[in-house]
């Protein structure tokens, strides 16, 4: 996750929420054995075309040496999501250049980028499908670790995010 999530709550102040969101992400990642790297930018302070932001993501990519990248859809609803999508696209290429200056020497491989569904899958036509039947339970357990965000989505947007994930996942299963 690129953002601290510091603005995403009705009651919890930003500094406190930053800590909570980082702990929730670490807990969720721990369920799947994932090292969580993130919280590089405050909410609504992520802008595409920003070299410093791109360079932070270049460092993450060069550090992780991924086999593939999953990022936000370029047409998502949230300005941070669309900016991250573009920054990841740009950084994924820059990270492959051996002479591109960064905190890591080893260049990353040029790998596929996969875009997630935007919120509720609106106006998105997948070109590839992955059967997540065996992982949906873990996915939901990981999602439920993000308690402060689930509460925020319910209170701010009226969205039961857990139900939406189940519904959208089932729909994509039928679709393929």
PLM regions and their residue ranges:
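Active-site rim/loop-helix segments in enzyme catalytic domains that contact anionic ligands
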Residues: 1-64
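Metal-dependent de-N-acetylase/amidase catalytic core
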Residues: 12, 48-176
